């Protein structure tokens, strides 16, 4: 009888991406594959070609909201739904990429004695994975320092896993897609899957100066394109889909938030990056720690948005471009490969099932 694996994870594109890498690998080996996600999350849009099961879930907020009173009941309902799904599907293993939707799934699996592997993308454990940790068999980390208080028997440092297609990007296709008229270095601006209004405003306030030295590709986020701007050498997108590998490969330098998925993709592509992490006031601080780690390794420049003016932003971008060869040299010293991480994770899953 074929083995079965259930994937879960959602809330952001980063929590879904690793599942999108692994799902075809297991389908290709003849495993039965299904997914458990939320009813309206981004994972429902991204997951294709496998059976998708929706459950009720609450958001694990760190701030005051009236919804906090309802969410425990949603999570309990999600645990019951997950428990019943485990009884029906009878999976051999659960792989969780994190996010609030994963908590009921992990608990439902534990109640059915199904082994669970969770993956933490950031340098510190997210709240969902902290809650899930006692119910899991293995914790796979992206950063070597993650989970310092977790036993070595449970914790495994796997390293980053990114979309394989990003390494197949073509610079000429990227240039053709953007249709830039002048041969200048390309500055790519990425604000994360939801966009970043602060970054958008800073870039638009700096355009006149930045366009003297760069062609600019600006990924703004849904509904955040400013159609009133028509400056030569500046192109805006809400989101870039299948052309993204070509845009990434075309870029000379990148301004980005500091989500784990994005910055490791840039590391694999050896793209000098200026990181502007989400602040501690608007997140749990994981992006600040991710950015600090990359800065210590010499992979990135980091600026904090509450300490930046238009002039300091422009200076930081120009400094990054001037010193880009130094950053590339530092990134060449990173020895982990994407294939290595994928194969190690598959081996861990196979070992747990045995």
UniProtKB/Swiss-Prot annotation:
Pathway: Cell wall biogenesis; peptidoglycan biosynthesis. The keyword Transferase applies. Keywords: Cell cycle, Cell division, Cell membrane, Cell shape, Cell wall biogenesis/degradation, Glycosyltransferase, Membrane, Peptidoglycan synthesis, Transferase. GO terms for molecular function: UDP-N-acetyl-D-glucosamine:N-acetylmuramoyl-L-alanyl-D-glutamyl-meso-2,6-diaminopimelyl-D-alanyl-D-alanine-diphosphoundecaprenol 4-beta-N-acetylglucosaminlytransferase activity; undecaprenyldiphospho-muramoylpentapeptide beta-N-acetylglucosaminyltransferase activity. It comes from Bacillus thuringiensis (strain Al Hakam). CDD domains: GT28_MurG (cd03785). Its EC number is 2.4.1.227. It is found in: Cell membrane. UDP-N-acetyl-alpha-D-glucosamine binds at residues 12-14, 163, 193, 287. GO terms for biological process: carbohydrate metabolic process; cell division; cell wall organization; lipid glycosylation; peptidoglycan biosynthetic process; regulation of cell shape. It comes from the Bacteria. This is UDP-N-acetylglucosamine--N-acetylmuramyl-(pentapeptide) pyrophosphoryl-undecaprenol N-acetylglucosamine transferase 1. It catalyses: di-trans,octa-cis-undecaprenyl diphospho-N-acetyl-alpha-D-muramoyl-L-alanyl-D-glutamyl-meso-2,6-diaminopimeloyl-D-alanyl-D-alanine + UDP-N-acetyl-alpha-D-glucosamine = di-trans,octa-cis-undecaprenyl diphospho-[N-acetyl-alpha-D-glucosaminyl-(1->4)]-N-acetyl-alpha-D-muramoyl-L-alanyl-D-glutamyl-meso-2,6-diaminopimeloyl-D-alanyl-D-alanine + UDP + H(+). NCBIfam families: PRK12446.1 (NF009102). It is a peripheral membrane protein. InterPro entries: GlcNAc_MurG, Glyco_trans_28_C, GlycoTrans_28_N. Cell wall formation. Catalyzes the transfer of a GlcNAc subunit on undecaprenyl-pyrophosphoryl-MurNAc-pentapeptide (lipid intermediate I) to form undecaprenyl-pyrophosphoryl-MurNAc-(pentapeptide)GlcNAc (lipid intermediate II). Belongs to the glycosyltransferase 28 family. MurG subfamily. GO terms for cellular component: plasma membrane. It is an enzyme of class 2 (transferase).
